[in-house]
Amino acid sequence: MITEGFPPNLNALKGSSLLEKRVDSLRQLNTTTVNQLLGLPGMTSTFTAPQLLQLRIIAITASAVSLIAGCLGMFFLSKMDKRRKVFRHDLIAFLIICDFLKAFILMIYPMIILINNSVYATPAFFNTLGWFTAFAIEGADMAIMIFAIHFAILIFKPNWKWRNKRSGNMEGGLYKKRSYIWPITALVPAILASLAFINYNKLNDDSDTTIILDNNNYNFPDSPRQGGYKPWSAWCYLPPKPYWYKIVLSWGPRYFIIIFIFAVYLSIYIFITSESKRIKAQIGDFNHNVLEEEKEKKKLFGLGHWGKAKWYFRSYFKLPLLHLLRNLKNFFTISFIDPNEETDDSGSSNGTFNFGESSNEIPTLFRKTNTGSDENVSASGGVRLLDYNSAKPLDMSKYAMSEQPDLERNNPFDCENDITLNPSELVSKQKEHKVTFSVENEGLDTRKSSMLGHQTFSCQNSLESPLAMYDNKNDNSDITSNIKEKGGIINNNSNNDDDDNNNNNDNDNDNNNSNNNNNNNNNNNNNNNNNNNNNNNNNNNNNNSNNIKNNVDNNNTNPADNIPTLSNEAFTPSQQFSQERVNNNADRCENSSFTNVQQHFQAQTYKQMKKRRAQIQKNLRAIFIYPLSYIGIWLFPIIADALQYNHEIKHGPTMWVTYIDTCVRPLSCLVDVIVYLFKEKPWNYSWAKTESKYLIEKYILKGELGEKEILKFCHSNWGKRGWYYRGKWKKRKCWKYSTNPLKRILWFVERFFKQLFELKLHFSFYDNCDDFEYWENYYSAKDSNDNKRTESDETKTNSSDRSLPSNSLELQAMLNNITAEEVEVPLFWRIIHHIPMLGGIDLDELNRLLKIRYNNDHFSLPGLKFALNQNKSHDKHQDVSTNSMVKSSFFSSNIVTNDDENSIEEDKNLRYSDASASENYLVKPTIPGTTPDPIIEAQNDNDSSDSSGIDLIAFLRNGPL
């Protein structure tokens, strides 16, 4: 309206015309009769009949696959041994159950519509299913939110630990509040799903839309309600308008969860990387890249303008860009390795722990053993905890790191305790090492020298004298002590006390192994022996030392007299051999040793931090893959939701996005189970695997289970159900060579599916089953390669003909004894044990593993040889019976004749027959059922241990008798 007396406002008229056009365009939205009756705007969720059929089939298929995967995942979770479970597994089960419920609800609606299409127009039907759908989806979102909160607390509140009464483990995170998880997960989604019925009785007014398609074949009532749920193509959910329904009740919380997951992960990433850099800065930079960069800068600047441009381009563009790309890669791959950090610990020129030394000069604590395995091995890997090898320096890293959990062991009991990085502990330990190895003005005292004696740190000796020729053969203290006896020229503070020198006038002191009691005993008993400077030296070094000593004895002089030009003229200034220079060089050697000690302990601390960081990275990859997979699952539904605001209302749905959206919505359960199986590997936590581990730890010192224990297990209640069985008995019943064709077929079918489950690319049906001699040698830990048949030798004959000669009465008697000892497992339990995670324990295989592991492990104790041989000189003619090998079940019945013999044989089975000691004092008792080394056997015949030694070995194997 134009007011009289005032000129018309052209801008206002133009704005009003544009607004009217916009309103007209909204009123001209195309729609269908079904959308108008349901209250759906425009062309939202408008499909043809074939498209609807395809979408519903996709939804049913994806939901069914997800349900099957959920059942499989719950089976593996339920069959994990309770000793191996931690709170994380409870959260995984909680997440799988929520996603399982969501997949089940999403499958109900399309199935009912395909069965009875008329219920599509029933408001009670789609409102009820819509409430359950919203409840299940929001419950799954709440579960992943709780998952993220739990791991955020583990990182930022590592001291929140509580004892798990069920397993005895220390649990963190939300473990103390675990009783609130299920109520919150049920209550919050129920409230959100119920709020959708606000304004349910309020009707939508879409009378101005243009109907272009009449598809009301379902007799919908003419009452488009604003609140409630709407039937979509393959599911029932919240209405797209008003927007607050889906934003407040569904997508808003979901976007918040996604942002929260990214924020938690980003904060953890920044926290760990910053702490790693701070620790590295506190304990020192081991790469020494600053000096190299300065040299490179001077070199490039010397090339003129082109060199300067190259340096600026590399410093301010290339390197920052590469650093950014590496950080992005590390962020998305959950890696905490510094892009500028060298990952090679081998001690190369660019290695992290290189201090200008060659690889041969790396300290022992950074080296691996001769077998190639790390010295820090868990007890389950053998008797490493009792390893005391005098030929090898002690590994100080074991003691310096004793307060920290074993980061290399994949132990489920520790997996949640190792995702925190405590820099204060690492730095404090490094400071403790500095204090412990502080050098006073007088030099290192005896105790410090003793501690340093365990490490093979190199010291660059700058003495240019004939003394240096003995440095590689004898300790410097050997020569200086003898010189001191001659003229008192050299005074070395690192020598032993005068009392020790007076008691051992002709002995050379071994400073590198001052803790070795055996060397002290040898010095007391043999006054004219020259101890080797390093027990790891070869025989040539020993021969050289003996030759030197022989020369000393022949000349009847002190070893110092054999040194060329060792006279007063030798120490004149012209010869650069003054007493002060020798003392100064010795002090510099000690200071150099101390510097190396400090650097090596710094490197050790940093290496420990790197191990912990690697464990954190591994565990974070295991736990954050669930939230990240959640984000990946909701990627296409988010795209589909974004298209609904404008594009779908005007033009209808984008079909390829809708297909993917319909497929991935129910697949959360499938993804959770795949991640769980891939990362957790629950088949390694079955009862059989866990019980086998505990049995190995129990019998590892004994070296075998023993026939008595095997039969005891087999005849127990669990053994009668097949949880404990003997491989010998099972192999003898092999169906591969049975005369019954049906049994042969079933054997091949069972072998096929077994290899299929193990994901073997090459199927092999060859087996030595039913070969009596082969399996007897195999389970006795003997070399059975000579007895192994080839496939060309196999013939389909009777099992008794293949295994036993028909004319052998002895073997036939053994077969009868085996049959009498066998335990018949019911058919039901035999079928059960073919199911994954429900297998039994092969006691024969476990016994064989114990024997092999015991033979390959170093087993020695401090002073064990001395305890075994302390009375050897008094009992040289005492013979010990060597017939104490435990017989297998094939021969046990032929040995026992009466009660007295039974008790004697049982006593023999509890003791070892002999104990052989090698040069480095490693005692290796003969394992029953194995063939001893003929060389060791000959040595034992000439030098057998006394009865007290055998009692000690028996005690170590079986405990107090």
From Swiss-Prot:
It is found in: Cell membrane. Residues 468-568, 783-805 are annotated as: Disordered. It comes from the Eukaryota. Residues 783-796 have a biased composition (Basic and acidic residues). Its main location: membrane. Keywords: Cell membrane, G-protein coupled receptor, Membrane, Phosphoprotein, Receptor, Transducer, Transmembrane, Transmembrane helix. SUPFAM superfamilies: Family A G protein-coupled receptor-like (SSF81321). Belongs to the G-protein coupled receptor GPR1/git3 family. GO terms for biological process: adenylate cyclase-activating G protein-coupled receptor signaling pathway; detection of sucrose stimulus; G protein-coupled receptor signaling pathway; glucose mediated signaling pathway; hexose mediated signaling; invasive growth in response to glucose limitation; pseudohyphal growth; sucrose mediated signaling. This is G protein-coupled receptor GPR1. It comes from Saccharomyces cerevisiae (strain ATCC 204508 / S288c) (Baker's yeast). It is a multi-pass membrane protein. Residues 1-56, 115-133, 199-250, 643-822 are extracellular. The gene is GPR1. GO terms for molecular function: D-glucose binding; G protein-coupled receptor activity. GO terms for cellular component: plasma membrane. Residues 502-558 have a biased composition (Low complexity). The lineage of its organism: Eukaryota, Fungi, Dikarya, Ascomycota, Saccharomycotina. The chain crosses the membrane at residues 57-79, 92-114, 134-156, 179-198, 251-273, 620-642, 823-843. Gene3D superfamilies: Rhodopsin 7-helix transmembrane proteins. InterPro entries: Glucose_rcpt_Git3_N, GPR1_C. Residues 80-91, 157-178, 274-619, 844-961 are cytoplasmic. The modification Phosphoserine is found at S373, S903.
